[in-house]
Amino acid sequence: MYTNYSLTSSDAMPRTYLVGTASPEMSKKKRQSANCDKPTRRVIHIIDTNEHSEVDLKNELPITCTNEDGEMTSSSWTSQTANDFLKLAYVNAKLDPSLPSQYFKQDIINVLQSLEIPGWSVPGSKESSLNKNLLTLTQIKGALTNVIYKIHYPNLPPLLMRIFGDSIDSVIDREYELKVIARLSFYDLGPKLEGFFENGRFEKYIEGSRTSTQADFIDRDTSIKIAKKLKELHCTVPLTHKEITDQPSCWTTFDQWIKLIDSHKEWVSNNVNISENLRCSSWNFFLKSFKNYKRWLYNDSAFTSKLLREDDKDSMINSGLKMVFCHNDLQHGNLLFKSKGKDDISVGDLTIIDFEYAGPNPVVFDLSNHLNEWMQDYNDVQSFKSHIDKYPKEEDILVFAQSYINHMNENHVKIASQEVRILYNLIIEWRPCTQLFWCLWALLQSGRLPQRPLIEGEKLMSEKAGLGDETHLMEHKNKENGKYDCSEDDSFNYLGFCKEKMSVFWGDLITLGVIDKDCPDIGKTDYLDTKLIF
């Protein structure tokens, strides 16, 4: 029975968050006043001031970007930036999508009223004027662990509601995510946040858009625009000094995920598990191969290692090895198009969404990862498969690389073919890295590893899926027992996805000369038809 379950307004009093870093005193206040009548404030800055000294903030970290008139401008972190913040409302309440629909809707209305979201609440009142019978919830398909809804009410702008998963497979560093959202908001990027609750948030819903498809990605004109859009992202959001000097976030995540998998000793010691899913003889062989690949990339590769060894730092910065703020997951569901004809779409009509994996990486990681997505068709019956025949041909990659380099070129000088060739080769050398990233993600998401509490410092990011057009939506309905299982529509074959990625990973390591083609420890391999250009 769910009688009297729904939240009352007094249970959900709002707090206001200022996105940045909280002092211990502020954190203590927050805990003491979670259910008080007056909102408390938490100061979280656009950039984490704990990561900077005054010297760091005075050092210019210039980034080139364009203004609304298309003119070149520069920006950098300054002491003034460190004092900027994003003001967010927060309410101490949880929403449970497993409740019967009418109770769930009433809880949503109560939280919306407490957050005082304009239009969705009555100013100065504890009671909402909204009728739960007129509220429509439409669940967005494709989110693999988080539950995402479009909320519609007559004559009100629709909202997007995310309810975070609470299992080990949906653990995300929400504190870092808040800082990322704050930074994106400072540059008018990312989700337009309306308010937070304990296990989720409300965002502005992007009307009149559709998610991109595999066909969009492989279209030459569209691919050029995507390259330019990525360049704009990379040139808009500066990194902190710490982010520039630390190792790329991809390697940090690898360390965390491998440590997590390795902690399941019974699973990793079973060579049948390893052979079936990682396409090799043993866990030890996998670990050795991963270390050998990383060592090869930084010490012996033809282009990455050469650029890192050069004294001319400009050569490295102008290549794909420059550390930038990356999206790290630009797949079909995370790129929205304004609903126009394909020929009418401009770079400004593209919107990148879902920054849960965003962070500092070399340019080449973002580019190589995106081009891998040409092989995926998440709308296909076999959505886990990697269609290797769809991977971009040499000319496609060269055009993509040239479009990226030439866009927002400060000197308006056409880039030499040598720089395009270098970026092309970096994309190939880093391709195993981006393949393996999502292979391990899929293994952790599969549920085949026994669940256990995370070791301190570990984090497992999730939700490799997007949102957008109405074809990815379904009505929220109750099961016969009055409960709604938000996972019942999740039929993605994680282990199949893992195996497909591993086959390409091993094929790449053979082609690049990291391991021998006749190595008896490797199982099924797939080979992509691109080679380095010398």
Swiss-Prot record:
It catalyses: ethanolamine + ATP = phosphoethanolamine + ADP + H(+); choline + ATP = phosphocholine + ADP + H(+). GO terms for cellular component: cytoplasm. It holds the Pfam family Choline_kinase. InterPro entries: Choline_kin_N, Kinase-like_dom_sf. Its EC number is 2.7.1.82. GO terms for biological process: phosphatidylcholine biosynthetic process; phosphatidylethanolamine biosynthetic process. The keyword Lipid metabolism applies. Induction: Induced by zinc-depletion via the transcription factor ZAP1. Expression is sensitive to intracellular zinc levels. Repressed by inositol. CDD domains: ETNK_euk. Keywords: ATP-binding, Cytoplasm, Kinase, Lipid biosynthesis, Lipid metabolism, Nucleotide-binding, Phospholipid biosynthesis, Phospholipid metabolism, Phosphoprotein, Transferase. The keyword Transmembrane does not apply. The modification Phosphoserine is found at S23. Pathway: Phospholipid metabolism; phosphatidylethanolamine biosynthesis; phosphatidylethanolamine from ethanolamine: step 1/3. Catalyzes the committed step of phosphatidylethanolamine synthesis via the CDP-ethanolamine branch of the Kennedy pathway. Also exhibits choline kinase activity, thus contributing to phosphatidylcholine synthesis via the CDP-choline pathway, but its preferred substrate is ethanolamine. Present with 3420 molecules/cell in log phase SD medium. PANTHER family: CHOLINE/ETHANOALAMINE KINASE, RE24176P. This is Ethanolamine kinase. It comes from Saccharomyces cerevisiae (strain ATCC 204508 / S288c) (Baker's yeast). The gene is EKI1.
